[in-house]
Regions:
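Sec-dependent N-terminal signal peptides
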Residues: 4-14
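Terminal presequence/propeptide segments associated with secretion/organelle targeting
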Residues: 2, 16-218
Length: 218
């Protein structure tokens, strides 16, 4: 785990106009799948400016909060992360007291000494995606021939690959199958544990309008 400080800013994010095109794509594969349509719709960025494992790109600004329970965006070179209010709701609630009701009144750290540590909070970056489909299918075939696949066969395949590739990297390695087993991918993650609350509006503002749109759209 990296020892760096990340500052969480919980905000209400307003909806914006969106195209009717639907679907979700892996960021590592968007170049061939959806980029031509994105460019046609007016996108000015080059593929390498959106996803790049070797150089700075837009993907480096996107984080998973608490292992994927929420998402956020890095908006400064000091590690400031902005996220939805509901992602930090439980943390704000746990930090609140009758004397300092941050949930109802909001909170802003005007100086670094005012930041509030969020115990157990994590932010995670995706650093690399590796296609291991051929190797995974070979492992699966071998397990089937040995009659040792069992009902947890897919998890066995994941475990073999995670152990093989996870030992020589500082990142966390997680295997997953996509498109009903047609693709097997390894995801390399970098997780930071020193996360601190620096700002949150009062709950009446942060949670205004409820969560209907949030759970209805990706």
């Amino acid at each position: 785990m990296k020892k760096a400080i990340f500052y969480l800013l919980a905000c209400v994010l307003l909806p914006v106009a969106a195209s009717a095109d639907e679907g979700m794509w892996l960021v590592s594969t968007f170049r061939d799948v959806i980029y031509p349509q994105m460019k046609k719709e007016g996108l000015k960025l080059k593929p390498g400016e959106i996803y790049n494992e070797e150089s700075p790109a837009l993907c480096n600004a996107i984080v998973a909060v608490d292992g994927g329970m929420g998402t956020g965006s890095v908006i400064s070179d000091k590690g400031l992360v902005i996220t939805n209010h509901h992602v930090a709701y439980g943390d704000i609630h746990s930090l609140s007291t009758p004397a300092k009701n941050y949930l109802e009144e909001g909170f802003w750290a005007l100086e670094q000494k005012d930041e509030l540590p969020l115990k157990g909070k994590t932010v995670t970056f995706l650093r690399q995606v590796r296609d291991v489909t051929d190797e995974a299918q070979a492992i699966r075939d071998s397990l089937e021939k040995a009659n040792s696949l069992g009902i947890f066969g897919t998890r066995k395949v994941y475990g073999i690959l995670e152990r093989k590739y996870g030992g020589d990297t500082p990142f966390e390695v997680e295997c997953a199958s996509m498109w009903k087993g047609k693709k097997y991918l390894l995801f390399y993650y970098e997780t930071y544990k020193d996360v601190r609350l620096v700002g949150a509006p009062p709950v009446k503002i942060g949670a205004f309008g409820g969560e209907q749109d949030n759970w209805g759209w990706p």
